[in-house]
């Protein structure tokens, strides 16, 4: 196919709660930004050929699959099976009407929920995926029962399925801590995750989270964030801003990544990519000195 004539169909998903954000980019253009989707189309607007972003609905009435051309390739941007299961089903139905390659097939995305990542990647050499279960508690006793029946040991991480960025995430340190921790949650039968906490504190009493972006089996460094808390997100950069040496550490990490880090993790990343069957995905993790990857999130 001549790239100047390439017809690319991007698939985006409206979450089950039917919510999204409208933003204005630096060119003054209006873009729809949806949670749980990679939103690649917004950054690839200048691709040659014809590009079309098709939005697949979440819950609601049946949706006609009206596309203005037959695509040469389909790029699925939907990345969260917890919040977009209906959109994923619809994207699979649409793809089945086409006859072209698909990047990040929705069938593979369905296998990237936290508990399936644990089940499917367990045993990969050089990879630690903490035990994770999904359940729907209606009271604190349900949480205690899940901890006991699944043989978790304290502390454990409790979070609502589909939430990211540390939202609705708590650490339960003991049985006595359950009620005190869970008062803030509406335990209405919604899906939650329990994850075995693995302490990854470094010798300086700080924590380090690495974000990798894997494309075609090659892991690229996105950032290194350092914090005095185990729960690290973008807001943790405030801690780094107050400690200039950590900014320098991140810069040095970038400089040395290809030579010092990538050789230690490439075989693990290769096996993970083969199991996930994804062309691109992200990993939030800790990388030990020997290259062992402790997974926080992967999708």
Predicted regions and their residues:
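Active-site nucleotide/adenylate-binding loops and adjacent lid/helix of ATP-dependent enzymes
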Residues: 5-20, 97-99, 107-208, 259
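Short, surface-exposed coil-to-beta transition loops
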Residues: 88, 207-209, 280-281
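Generic beta-strand structural signal
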Residues: 104, 214-215, 287
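Phosphate-binding site of ATP-dependent enzymes
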Residues: 170-260, 264-267
């Amino acid at each position: 196919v001549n790239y100047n004539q390439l017809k690319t169909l991007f698939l985006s998903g409206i979450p089950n709660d039917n919510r999204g954000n409208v933003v204005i980019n630096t060119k003054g253009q209006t873009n729809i930004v949806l949670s749980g989707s990679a939103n690649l189309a917004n950054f690839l607007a200048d691709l040659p050929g014809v590009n079309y972003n098709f939005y697949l609905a979440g819950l609601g009435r049946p949706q006609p699959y009206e596309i203005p051309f037959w695509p040469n390739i389909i790029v699925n941007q939907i990345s969260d099976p917890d919040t977009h299961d209906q959109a994923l089903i619809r994207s699979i139905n649409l793809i089945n009407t086409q006859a072209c390659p698909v990047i990040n097939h929705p069938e593979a995305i369905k296998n990237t929920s936290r508990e399936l990542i644990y089940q499917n990647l367990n045993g990969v050499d050089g990879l630690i995926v903490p035990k994770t279960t999904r359940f729907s508690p209606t009271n604190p006793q349900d949480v205690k029962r899940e901890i006991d029946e699944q043989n978790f040991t304290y502390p454990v991480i409790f979070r609502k399925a589909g939430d990211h960025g540390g939202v609705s995430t708590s650490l339960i340190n003991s049985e006595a801590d359950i009620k005190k921790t869970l008062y803030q949650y509406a335990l209405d039968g919604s899906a939650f995750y329990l994850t075995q906490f693995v302490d990854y504190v470094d010798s300086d009493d700080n924590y380090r989270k690495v974000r990798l972006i894997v494309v075609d089996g090659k892991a690229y460094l996105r950032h290194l964030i350092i914090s005095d808390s185990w729960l690290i997100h973008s807001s943790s950069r405030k801690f780094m801003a107050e400690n200039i040496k950590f900014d320098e550490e991140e810069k040095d990490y970038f400089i040395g990544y290809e030579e010092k880090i990538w050789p230690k993790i490439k075989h693990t990343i290769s096996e993970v990519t083969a199991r996930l069957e994804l062309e691109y995905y992200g990993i939030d993790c800790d990388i030990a000195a020997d290259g062992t990857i402790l997974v926080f999130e992967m999708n």
